[in-house]
Swiss-Prot record:
It comes from Limnodynastes interioris. Keywords: Secreted. It is found in: Secreted. The lineage of its organism: Eukaryota, Metazoa, Chordata, Craniata, Vertebrata. The keyword Secreted applies. This is Dynastin-1. Expressed by the skin glands. One of its GO terms (cellular component) is extracellular region.
Length: 8
């Protein structure tokens, strides 16, 4: 997800 910091 966007909030994961991985941009997934």
């Amino acid at each position: 997800g966007l909030l994961s910091g991985l941009g997934l």
